[in-house]
């Protein structure tokens, strides 16, 4: 009987240790999770973010390359996107609505590295830019 109790105790200890080890590898609930930046959905969100940045600009910027993507589940989804930008061929004041197909880069020279956080609630058709910050490419 003592052997049986010792065996059950040992199994419990091993299972508890295995459970705590696997928890450390899981993403924190509500935390940021790294995603694959080659997913076209994320590129579209980056283009959406640049399309909202018009104040004080003559031309829209456009996305050159998506560098990093993170997602966070909240009451919807937050997307944190890091990408490079340059000026596009689309003048803002002409009334042309931004699109990644129409607003091509004037050059392939990186003018800024930007980070945008976009909040979406798909089932309520909500999408908005919570923050948008850019730095010179050599500052990153």
Regions found by a protein language model. Give the residues of each.
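N- and C-terminal low-complexity/disordered segments
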Residues: 2-140
């Amino acid at each position: 009987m003592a052997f049986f109790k010792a065996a059950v105790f040992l199994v419990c200890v091993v299972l508890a240790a295995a459970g705590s080890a696997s928890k450390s590898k899981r993403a924190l609930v509500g935390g940021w999770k790294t995603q694959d930046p080659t997913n076209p959905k994320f590129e579209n969100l980056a283009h959406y973010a640049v399309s909202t940045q018009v104040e004080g600009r003559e031309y829209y910027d456009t996305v050159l390359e998506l560098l990093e993507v993170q997602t966070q589940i909240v009451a919807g989804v937050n997307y944190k996107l890091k990408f490079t930008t340059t000026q596009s061929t689309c003048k803002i004041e002409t009334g042309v609505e931004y699109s990644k197909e129409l607003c091509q880069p004037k050059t392939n020279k990186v003018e800024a590295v930007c980070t945008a956080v976009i909040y979406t609630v798909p089932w309520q058709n909500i999408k908005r830019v919570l923050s948008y910050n850019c730095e010179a490419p050599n500052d990153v």
